[in-house]
Design a protein with these regions (language model features):
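Anionic-ligand binding patches
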Residues: 14-17, 23-207
Length: 207
């Protein structure tokens, strides 16, 4: 684990560390924010750490990740945890979405396992859920968002990441992986949670 450099500063309300090593998530979050907010990834903040996700709920994992970075960097930050919940699989993979097929976080294997477990199952309903924890002055604030949809039988599309290639959101005939980032943001669970985060940050700036 590497600590933030001594000259690292992130004290402005509109500059926040995003407690993730997932560059795809950083790109999505940045696409949802305007120029009034600056988001730093862990790497950009000089922090090299793999934060554990030991809990059974998205909320607890988001809080844990945000709290770890807040204590480490001594500055405001936020974290998110996202899970795919499939009704026919009793809401699996859920909090284990990134490690569904093993600790190596291989999403090709994760998708293959998901499709195998759903083989011949006619109930394909699923939803993505995102929970964001914003930590300011040691206080945690929770924001969530969800996107309902369907798991298709075969992968489609080359964009996105994770389970995007097999998830079709309600109201669309495309998988997330077939959409541009702008299209995906029309449905995105992450966008819905991020919009709540932004609204809260704007109220703080007015105070």
């Amino acid at each position: 684990m590497e600590l933030p450099s001594e000259n690292f500063q992130c004290k402005k309300m509109n500059t926040l560390i995003f407690a993730t090593n997932n560059e795809n998530k950083v790109i999505e979050i940045r696409s949802l924010l305007d120029d009034n907010f600056q988001i730093l990834s862990l790497a950009e903040a000089g922090i090299n750490i793999d934060i554990p996700e030991p809990f059974d709920t998205l909320e607890e994992n988001a809080i844990e990740k945000s709290e770890v970075i807040y204590k480490l960097a001594k500055t405001d930050c936020f974290a998110e945890d996202t899970g795919l919940e499939v009704k026919a699989l009793h809401n699996e993979p859920g909090v284990k979405s990134a490690r569904y097929a093993g600790e190596e976080r291989d999403f090709d294997k994760n998708v293959a396992k998901l499709l195998a477990n759903l083989k011949n199952n006619t109930d394909r309903f699923a939803r993505f859920r995102t929970v964001i924890c914003l930590t300011i002055n040691g206080t945690h604030n929770i924001f969530d968002g969800e996107c309902k949809g369907t798991i298709i039988a075969e992968r489609k599309g080359s964009g996105g990441f994770g389970y995007d290639c097999v998830f079709v959101p309600e109201g669309s005939s495309k998988t997330f992986a077939e959409m541009s980032l702008q299209e995906k943001n029309k449905y995105s669970h992450r966008k819905k949670a991020t919009q709540k985060l932004i609204s809260y940050l704007k109220t703080l700036k007015k105070q």
